Amino acid sequence: MKYALFSVPVGTIYDLPQTIKEGEAGLVSTIGDEGLYGQACQVRTAPGGVTAAGVRLPPDVAEVVSFYGYHGYVNQRELQFVREEELWEYLGADLVLVGRATDVLSLPKVQGVRMMELERGGVLRRQPETAEEAEAHKGWAKVLLTDGRTGYVRDVALEPVKYEMTAVFSQREGLAFNDALAETLDTTADKLVPEAVARWYGGEDAFRAAVCEQAKKYMGTEYRWGGKSGRGIDCSGLVSSAYMQCGVLIYRDAKIIEGWPMHEVAFENKKPGDALFFPGHVALYLGEGRYIHSTGAAASGGVVINSLEPDDPLYREDLVKCLYAVGSVF
């Protein structure tokens, strides 16, 4: 098996080996998802190879499965291919999450040369420093890029990586995602969420609040089909990213799928941090009748807050009428 890390700030994952297809109204994009810098994927078929389905790939396109179970196709120029032992070493290092759009600089000072511009959600490997270096570089973190170069990022831009990417080693046809992740963590699928919540938040209420706050960080971001970054994000990209950054990996698209942590609960039992499902759309419930979502509606065109309550000025009747499920990881 081969592996790779996304080596560009925002990589594109296509649902087909080509970038466009014929739709009812003409040519449309085949974009399904995005991979952010430093995130891992399993390479099912190398560029130019033949897939298990018998499809010959273009010479510059690889078939991949992301560490959270999304299958697609990526141009090789957006990937840094690595050996299994290299990826294990990377995942076992001190990884940090880019908590906001930020620059990687050549020096621990604002005058440093800009090496890369990263979006929130990207992953970097923190490099160890001596006590003297840390004091001299106070306020900055020394980081390792996927190509081996070192640079510096402001400490205030970084957060701990709370999720696990190790399912990339065990994912295979016929194995549920929860079981694949549990296999590499030496636990069971039913313990994945409780263990992550206990480790990072100490309890359900704190986790729910954190998921809501992560989603709010994308307020005002434009709607982008298949997007998952501050450059543009779609409905399921918003909800799955909020959960991911809080340590729980849910299904990427706007539906509840068996084998991932989320399951349906009664509407009257909904709590902040639960997901609201509509046909082809998903939102995150914030409490008191309000929810946050990324909507392609012309009046919004991005991440906004709306309401389920008719007397709220943020009420959207069209969505309330077609709400069909509430999803929870608890």
Q: What residue spans do the PLM features occupy?
A:
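Asp-box/WD-like beta-propeller blade repeats and closely related beta-sheet repeat scaffolds
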Residues: 91-130
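Low-complexity, Gly/Ser/Thr/Pro-rich intrinsically disordered linker/tail segments
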Residues: 311-330
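Loop/turn positions that initiate beta-strands
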Residues: 38, 50, 118-127, 191, ...
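...with weaker cross-activation on analogous glycine-rich loops/strands in unrelated enzymes
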Residues: 248-311
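Short, well-ordered loop/turn sites that connect or cap secondary structure elements
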Residues: 29, 35, 118, 269-270, ...
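Active-site nucleophilic cysteine motif
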Residues: 215, 227-246
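Short alpha-helix capping/helix-loop boundary micro-motifs
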Residues: 21-30, 103-114, 258-267
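Boundary regions of SH3-family modules and the immediately adjacent low-complexity/disordered segments
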Residues: 1-13, 18-29, 37-51, 56-96, ...
